[in-house]
Regions:
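Glycine-rich, Lys/Arg-enriched anion-binding loops that position phosphate/diphosphate groups
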Residues: 140-239
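General small-molecule cofactor/ligand-binding pocket signal
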Residues: 2-4, 87-89, 146-150
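Phosphate/ribose-recognition catalytic cores of enzymes acting on nucleotide-derived substrates
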Residues: 194-306
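Extreme N-terminal starter segment of soluble prokaryotic enzymes
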Residues: 1-3, 14-15
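N-terminal catalytic cores of NTP/NDP-binding nucleotidyl/phosphoryl-transfer enzymes
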Residues: 8-71
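Residue-level signal for inorganic ion chemistry
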Residues: 26, 79, 117, 177, ...
Length: 306
């Protein structure tokens, strides 16, 4: 996949494209992208995606802070796996936000040689997103762009969308979110120094500082997770929360106890992959009660992952 981020880049070879933010690059996105590739193969054209590094709403509403399923870097890595030919990573500016659907289509045709647009069945674009697929078809006839309305994708009766997946993660339903994503949800970051309380009670933890400040953090609680450090995979139990038994502070921490592990990984990059929600975070009357519960959590995690 060749990434093009310059709006003045030379035109592509004749291509079929679709437009979207593609947050999380979930199964619904992949279904749409596969339709782009099918049309391109049938017509002897190249396949392309039109997307943006920032969420468009951040430009239109500057106080908006998205809860992303994938950071900009992660999104490109996921899109790479779709094996499309080109990714047009266009900077979403105020000027771009004011273009009508017809003007944006004209830009794609004249600047990038897009011959066919495959539009998601419920997707709208252009200033205020006020126009319909029928309008796009009319503009397509004027601009010599063939329009295709993509087939909808569902999982049984469930509609798959980034907003649905976000809500599942906010509720701790990481297993169902993984079904919709097509992979386990993950957080990338760096291991940072903590208070080392876990070590004192027999459960040393690695504290994760997430790379992308806009990345969605799942609901507080305890999870069975996979941990990736320097290309190696480990099982772990993760706590997201305030550690109420040993801490009265308000800061949310992301701490993982890695099973059968004793290496020093401070300041190293780490990926946490969510597999199963175990329980909510709770406050215990004594440290001994907390330790007893953590032993139960570790046994349950081992049964799930090992």
């Amino acid at each position: 996949m060749k990434i093009i981020s310059d709006i003045n880049h030379q035109a592509l070879p004749p291509s079929v494209a679709t437009i979207g933010f593609f947050d999380g690059v979930h199964r619904g996105h992949r279904f749409l992208i596969n339709q782009v590739k099918e049309v391109a193969d049938k017509d002897g054209l190249y396949s392309a995606l039109v997307t943006f590094p920032m969420h468009p709403r951040q430009v239109i509403q500057t106080t908006y802070h998205p809860q992303l399923l994938s950071s900009p870097k992660e999104k490109l890595e996921l899109l790479e796996t779709t094996q499309v030919d080109y990714c047009l990573l266009l900077p979403f500016t105020q000027e771009l936000s004011l273009l009508s659907a017809r003007e944006f289509m004209q830009l794609l045709r004249n600047k990038f040689n897009i011959h066919t647009l495959v539009i998601g069945y419920d997707h709208r674009f252009g200033h205020n997103r006020s126009e319909s697929f029928e309008d796009y078809c009319r503009y397509g006839e004027e601009l010599n762009i063939y329009m295709v309305r993509a087939r909808a994708y569902t999982d049984g009766e469930d509609k798959i969308s980034s907003s649905v997946i976000r809500q599942l993660l906010k509720e701790g339903k990481v297993s169902q979110a993984a079904q919709f994503l097509g992979y386990n949800y993950y957080l990338d970051g760096t291991v940072v120094d903590g208070y080392k309380v876990g070590r004192k009670i027999g459960f040393p933890t690695a504290n994760l500082q997430v790379d992308c400040s806009d990345k969605l953090i799942p609901s507080e609680g305890v999870y069975a997770v996979y941990v990736y450090v320097e290309g190696k995979k480990w099982a772990g139990m993760l706590n997201i929360g305030h550690r109420p038994t040993i801490n009265n502070g308000n800061n949310v921490s992301i701490e993982v106890n890695i099973l059968n592990f004793s290496e020093d990984i401070y300041h190293k990059e780490m990926r946490i992959e969510f597999v199963k929600y175990l329980r909510p975070e709770e406050k215990y009357g004594t440290i001994d009660e907390l330790i007893a519960q953590m032993h139960k959590d570790r046994e349950k995690t081992a049964k799930i992952l090992l």
